[in-house]
UniProtKB/Swiss-Prot annotation:
Belongs to the UreF family. The keyword Zinc-finger does not apply. It comes from Staphylococcus saprophyticus subsp. saprophyticus (strain ATCC 15305 / DSM 20229 / NCIMB 8711 / NCTC 7292 / S-41). This is Urease accessory protein UreF. GO terms for cellular component: cytoplasm. GO terms for molecular function: nickel cation binding. Disulfide bonds: none annotated. UreD, UreF and UreG form a complex that acts as a GTP-hydrolysis-dependent molecular chaperone, activating the urease apoprotein by helping to assemble the nickel containing metallocenter of UreC. The UreE protein probably delivers the nickel. Keywords: Chaperone, Cytoplasm, Nickel insertion. Required for maturation of urease via the functional incorporation of the urease nickel metallocenter. PANTHER family: UREASE ACCESSORY PROTEIN F (PTHR33620:SF1). It comes from the Bacteria. The gene is ureF. Pfam families: UreF (PF01730).
Length: 229
């Protein structure tokens, strides 16, 4: 039997869901312009790196910690994690891009669901106490729907992999079949990533690959662009 709570959460993974993810490459466009990423194989290598670094030690670990804080009704911990996610995201474009996507996701979630936590998170932004991050909002929504944290992380990783793959299909370019082949190959890697996220200590929050951050910073100066970040 289909779990409708899971389907409701999966709605937010749809590539047509208007969070603005289609406008952000999170540094991928810099790699493409330098011809470091130029085909199916090189893009998948980049995607695995992004998954195993930024989506693991920033978004993914934060989601696990936020879920625990929600269960403990620890608002201070959630605001601290929101702040850490914002300030440790050094490249300006990716920092602002995440904030923009978080704002859109929170507003859409508020329209669709009457969640005390999401309404509270939105209010914290209005009071300038939170920046709003999509990873935190997604976790709050999954928690509201009664979905376990492992599944919430699975869906969030899938949403990012799917969105970035569609952006690569446009930018490299790749064929749609190649894009689906990449997503198919990434599914077992996503499971490994989620399993790793569930074991790493909170002290490792924010670890990332310098090369990713440098290329995200340098995207500000690319001559021709189709993405905001």
């Amino acid at each position: 039997m289909i779990d409708h709570a899971h389907l409701r959460l999966f709605q937010f993974c749809d590539s047509q869901f208007p969070t603005g993810a289609f406008s952000h490459s999170f540094g991928l466009e810099t790699y493409i312009q330098r011809d470091t990423v130029h085909d199916e194989e090189s893009f998948q290598q980049w995607l695995v790196l992004f998954l195993n670094e930024q989506l693991t030690y920033a978004d993914g670990l934060t989601m696990r910690l936020v879920y625990d804080a929600l269960n403990e009704n620890d608002t201070k911990a959630i605001l601290k994690l929101d702040r850490i996610l914002f300030v440790q995201n050094l490249p300006k474009e990716t920092r602002q891009g995440s904030k923009q996507m978080g704002n859109r996701m929170v507003k859409l979630a508020s329209e669709l669901y009457d969640s005390d936590w999401i309404n509270w998170y939105h209010a914290q932004m209005k009071d300038k106490k939170a920046s709003l991050h999509p990873a935190i909002c997604f976790t709050m929504l999954g928690h509201h729907l009664g979905v376990d944290i492992e599944t919430i992380i699975d869906y969030y990783l899938y949403q990012n992999v799917s969105s970035l793959t569609q952006n690569a299909v446009r930018a490299i370019p790749l064929g749609q079949t190649a894009g689906q082949r990449i997503v198919h190959k990434m599914i077992p890697i996503m499971k490994e990533t989620r399993d790793h996220i569930m074991t790493i200590p909170a002290s490792q929050l924010g670890i990332t690959a310098p090369g990713l951050e440098i290329n995200q910073m340098e995207h500000e100066n690319v001559n021709v662009r189709i993405f905001i970040s």
